[in-house]
């Protein structure tokens, strides 16, 4: 992977005019981010009501028909599902709506192959994938800050023009992302490991919670660990079916390896054997996940603060931390079932933990370190 931010940040300004074709979560978030930068944004969607909702949210102006939009944009962002990328690219190029084109699909080899088959002009096309998202979908879930500090993969082809890469890189930077470069095949193998297979694993675990598998009352004992493991399983099933089907081979390889580890752990537990080796490998893997701003993982001290479940309590806590000069690096809230309180887990640098504890106790909170 080659990071592109340093190469392009001063080389080209953000595109002045952008067409976003597809106004779901990602497309509308791109539009909102660009609008904050003063970019003129045009919106298109097969469902005109969805496009109009995005427009009502301030994402741009609706274009009812791409056939009437010749030359409307410098860059067209194709924010459609993987299976629709090639056809949308062909339609947009036939209508000559932009100089350069990119997409946001989370798989790259299949759309590229289909675009070749359709005879698309690949010299002005930069396959792309912003690695950001939410469990929710649709324009109402969009956020202008969705891409801040997030990796945005660009996968230019041998025939892609350098000016196209520069324009799309500038667009990613304008959205606040950190653009990196990878070839399509490598991209698909890597996202199978870090994105696609984890979604299947989360879905498999979450499926165990549906009747009749889950015993009555068991979910009353659910804690933050279960929520962490299953959170992404709430994603759009239809979209994820497309994603997984488009990257089936690499995802299947990762799942087979995970299944092997789980089967070995099950055999070990059935025979009262030790599973420490797997758990240790898991800890080592977590330690390799990039930390804040994509840098090396850092070790933080977690301070637990009991907070009342009422309006303004969390803001009061943050204000107290700020007044003490403490930067909260991360926060997680665990609610107590049936009780009007929760526990805020505040991650801070070890050298600031003492100051935070003192500030919390002075503010009347119960704390635990």
Describe the residue ranges of each PLM region.
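Residues in the short beta-alpha loop(s) of Rossmann-like NAD(P)-binding domains
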Residues: 46-47, 105, 334
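Rossmann-like NAD(P)-binding element
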Residues: 66-102
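NAD(P)+-binding Rossmann beta1-loop-alpha1 motif at the extreme N-terminus of oxidoreductases
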Residues: 2-65
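Residues at the starts of beta-strands that form the adenosine-phosphate
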Residues: 17, 40, 124, 151, ...
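A conserved regulatory-domain signal marking ACT and ACT-like small-molecule sensing domains
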Residues: 285-369
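Internal alpha-helical scaffold of NAD(P)-dependent oxidoreductase catalytic cores
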Residues: 146-232
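Interdomain hinge/lid region at the active-site interface
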Residues: 214-283, 302
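Rossmann-like NAD(P)(H) cofactor-binding subdomain of soluble oxidoreductases
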Residues: 88-140
């Amino acid at each position: 992977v080659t990071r592109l931010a340093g190469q392009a940040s001063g080389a080209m300004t953000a595109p002045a005019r952008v067409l976003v074709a597809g106004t779901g979560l990602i497309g509308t978030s791109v539009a909102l981010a660009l609008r904050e930068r003063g970019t003129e944004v045009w919106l298109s969607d097969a469902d005109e009501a969805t496009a109009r909702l995005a427009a009502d949210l301030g994402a741009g102006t609706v274009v009812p028909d791409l056939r009437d939009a010749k030359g409307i944009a410098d860059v067209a962002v194709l924010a459609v599902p993987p299976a629709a990328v090639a056809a949308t690219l062909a339609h947009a190029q036939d209508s000559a709506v932009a100089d350069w084109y990119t997409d946001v699909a989370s798989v790259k080899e299949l759309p590229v192959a289909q675009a070749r088959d359709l005879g698309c002009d690949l010299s002005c096309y930069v396959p792309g994938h912003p690695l950001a998202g939410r469990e929710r979908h649709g324009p109402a879930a969009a956020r202008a800050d969705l891409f801040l500090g997030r990796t945005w993969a660009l996968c230019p082809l041998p025939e892609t023009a350098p000016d196209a890469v520069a324009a799309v890189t500038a667009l990613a930077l304008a959205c606040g992302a950190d653009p990196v470069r990878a070839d399509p095949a490598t991209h698909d193998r890597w996202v199978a490991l870090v994105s696609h297979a984890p979604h299947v694993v989360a879905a498999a675990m979450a499926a165990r919670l549906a009747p009749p598998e889950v015993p009555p009352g068991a979910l009353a004992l659910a804690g933050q660990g279960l929520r962490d493991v299953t959170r992404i399983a709430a994603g759009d099933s239809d979209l994820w079916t497309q994603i997984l089907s488009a990257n089936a081979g690499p995802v299947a390889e990762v799942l087979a390896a995970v299944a092997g580890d789980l089967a070995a752990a099950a055999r070990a537990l059935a025979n009262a054997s030790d599973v420490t080796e797997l758990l240790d490998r898991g800890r080592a893997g977590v330690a390799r996940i990039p930390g804040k701003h994509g840098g090396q993982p850092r070790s933080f001290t977690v301070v637990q603060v009991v907070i009342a479940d009422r309006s303004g309590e969390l803001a009061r806590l943050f204000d107290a931390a700020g007044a003490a000069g403490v930067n909260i690096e991360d926060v997680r809230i665990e609610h107590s079932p049936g009780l009007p309180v929760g526990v805020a887990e505040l991650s801070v640098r070890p050298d600031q933990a003492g100051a935070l504890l003192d500030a919390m106790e002075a503010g009347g909170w119960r704390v635990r370190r």
